[in-house]
Every structure is written in C-alpha cells, then in structure tokens.
Swiss-Prot record:
Coiled-coil region list: none
Species, as recorded: Bdellovibrio bacteriovorus (strain ATCC 15356 / DSM 50701 / NCIMB 9529 / HD100)
InterPro entries in UniProt: LS (IPR034964), LS/RS (IPR002180), LS/RS_sf (IPR036467)
Taxonomic path: Bacteria, Pseudomonadati, Bdellovibrionota, Bdellovibrionia, Bdellovibrionales
Protein name (Swiss-Prot/TrEMBL): 6,7-dimethyl-8-ribityllumazine synthase
Annotated keywords: Riboflavin biosynthesis, Transferase
GO MF, one example: 6,7-dimethyl-8-ribityllumazine synthase activity
Family of this protein: Belongs to the DMRL synthase family.
Described purpose of this protein according to its UniProt entry: Catalyzes the formation of 6,7-dimethyl-8-ribityllumazine by condensation of 5-amino-6-(D-ribitylamino)uracil with 3,4-dihydroxy-2-butanone 4-phosphate. This is the penultimate step in the biosynthesis of riboflavin.
C-alpha cells in the first residue's frame, strides 16, 4: 500500500487562529508514517467544502477541514456554521471518505484561542487525529467484511450437514420407540 494522502483545508478568515489550528494538524500528520500532506488556504469557512471536494476528487484518502466562525451581531454566523457543517457532512457521505472537522464555532475570540493551542487543546490536531483514525477504519471495515463473508460461505456447508445428521438420529429414535 502506498502513502496515505491527506488534504488540509484552512480558512484565512481569522487567520491568527486558523494558522494555529493548521500548525497542530500538520504537526500531527507529519509525525504519522507514510502520510503525504497537501495543503490549501481558502478565503473563509464557506469555501471549505469546495476545497475538500477538490482534494477528494484528486484522490486524497481524507481531508482535515479547519476554520473559525465567531458569533457576531447578525444571523450570518448561523448560516455560515450550517453551510460548512452540511457541506462537509454531505461530502463525507457522497465520497465515503473522512473529513476531520476542525471548524471552531465559538461565541468569541477567547473561546477560539483556547481551542487553538490554549487551555482546551488544539482542535486542528484533534481533527487530524480523527481523519487518520477514520481513514484506517474505513479501510479496515471492507477487509473485515470480506473475511467474514469468506468465513460465512464456508460455515453454511458444515452447518447444513449437522441438521441432516440430527434429523437422521431423530428418525432412528422414532423407529426404535415404535418397535
């Protein structure tokens, strides 16, 4: 098996925070064996799904999505959060490939900083961990299912003989009782 290809999509909006998320994600991925990292910057959070899609279409095994959306005085926050979340989720299901969701949706800048290497860890690193775990899982499940199917194909032949033998024994017992 070749190298695992992972895309990292980072929004430039709130770049003082997103750059820390990106550092955490890339640092984690660089420590993994046989991983090839591809990175792209996008203007804002709404553009994240399109860049994720481009990476998946180009053959990446998974993507890390990084951004920061901080609540303001208007409903724009809700639309952006829903748009990004729905877009990334749809891509995962359509492409059957994992996207680690490291898009912070916070009430203020302090909360975002706390999650970009502060008191609450680095959510960029965590998103990279999730991506790698899910790449492994999505590769293991088909292999395990194939093995299980192969075992199941062998098992019914043995199981079919057992009921026939049991039925024959039952018939012999019935004959003995009738005599």
């Amino acid at each position: 098996m070749g190298k695992i290809k992972v895309g990292v999509v980072t929004a430039r909006w709130n770049q003082e925070i997103t750059s820390k998320l990106e550092e955490g994600a890339i640092s984690y991925l660089e420590a993994c064996e046989d991983v090839e990292i591809f990175a792209a910057l996008v203007p804002g959070a709404v553009e994240i799904p399109l860049a994720c899609q481009a990476f998946l279409e180009a053959g990446c095994d998974g993507v890390v999505a990084l951004g920061v959306v901080i609540r303001g005085d208007t409903s724009h926050y809700d639309y952006v959060c829903n748009s990004v979340t729905d877009g990334v989720t749809r891509l995962m299901l359509d492409y059957k490939k994992p996207i680690g969701f490291g898009v912070l949706t916070t009430e203020n800048e302090e909360q975002a900083l706390a999650r970009a290497g502060g008191d609450h860890g680095n959510k960029g690193e965590e998103a990279a961990q999730v991506t790698m775990e899910m790449i492994g899982l999505t590769q293991e499940i088909p292999a395990a299912m194939k093995t299980a199917l192969m075992l199941a194909k062998k098992a019914p032949a043995k199981a079919a003989k057992k009921p026939a033998k049991a039925a024959a024994k039952t018939q012999k017992k019935k004959k003995k009782v009738r005599k």
